[in-house]
Amino acid sequence: MLLGGCKSLNITDDNKKTLDFTVVERDGIPAELFSVIEERKSEAFTMSYSIDGYLYIAVGYGEKSTGGYSIRVDDVYETDSNLGIHTTLIGPAAGEAVNKMATYPYVVVKLEYIDKNIIFE
């Protein structure tokens, strides 16, 4: 099942539990999810996909005019009623030599399936 969207919600630390997750490399992304990412990568996106007892959460930042970008996963957490993911796009350092081709930074994380709404921060 593939889902997309986002919601803003105030999360308090007292009901928040950090979850174990894995950042998935390109060859580990399920084919159906990768296909949708390829279709949507030129615009910012958030989506989730579940298969075989795992949940994949994807966050993309749209087209960037150069290379040199990376994404940091700051937190993946669970509350009483939601899952959450917080990511940060990190741009190239000042003066860093970068590829002058358009790039489409995104990250996919994998965790055990939990049936809750996902909050993207």
Task: Please give the residue ranges for each predicted region.
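Exposed, flexible binding/inhibitory loops of compact, secreted disulfide-stabilized domains
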Residues: 4-121
